[in-house]
Regions:
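Cys/His-clustered metal-coordination modules, chiefly Zn-binding fingers
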Residues: 114, 120-202
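Long, charged N-terminal interaction/targeting segments
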Residues: 3, 7-152
Length: 202
């Protein structure tokens, strides 16, 4: 699974490898409630928007595209995930427990999650290698878990679509527009404000 995740992620990131172990742990915990993994629909919540997302996607098949992986439900930036049965909403949250990481024995691992790594005096690749090596000595020893009931809709509502009167493209009506009297997509709104994400050059 680590090899698959690394191939998908394209770089040897500590967070990705640690995430693989976290997902594996959460799946094992779920097996205690639901021994047959094919008997229910697995969903996931990710509390951060970095490497852990890819660990979840490659190991569970819960992706942003199929909406089995929820990213917007929680925006707290904690390195944690929840795997749960969509029908019962019951599952497990696995998270990094900093109290279990000895700062003296595993300085790079602690610094990685505390965001205190010294990038000025070391190369990022070297720090990542040291972090991974320290993690492999403790593995699940730095995780804690909680049994949880997830309070989000089992399925996302179908968002209405509109046709932008400026660019002519259809778009999902997700947020309140700046000018509710006109059907203008978010990109064209930002373009009018000269704050667009990209500029068409040809």
């Amino acid at each position: 699974d680590i090899d698959k995740a690394l191939e998908f992620h394209k770089k040897n990131a500590p967070g990705l490898i640690i995430g693989v172990y976290m997902v594996d742990y959460a799946l094992e915990l779920l097996d205690g409630i639901y021994p047959d993994r094919n008997s229910y629909t697995l969903n996931a919540l990710c509390e951060t928007r970095v490497c852990l997302i890819d660990s979840i996607q490659i190991m569970t098949g819960c992706t942003v595209g199929n909406k089995y992986l929820k990213l917007n439900a929680m925006k707290n930036g904690r390195y944690a995930l929840i795997l749960y049965n969509r029908d019962t909403s019951l599952g497990y949250r696995v998270y990094i427990d900093l109290s279990k990481i000895d700062k003296e024995k595993y300085p790079q691992l602690y610094a990685f999650f505390a965001k205190t790594r010294d990038y000025k005096n070391a190369v990022r690749k070297e720090l990542s290698k040291a972090t991974i090596e320290e993690f492999y000595t403790v593995e699940r020893g730095i995780f804690s878990y909680q049994k949880v009931k997830v309070n989000v809709p089992a399925k996302d509502p179908l968002e209405p679509a509109k046709i932008c009167e400026i660019c002519g493209e259809s778009y999902l009506f997700l947020e309140k527009p700046l000018n509710p009297e006109r059907d203008i997509c978010p990109y064209c709104e930002q373009k009018l404000l000269k704050n667009e994400v990209f500029e068409v050059i040809s």
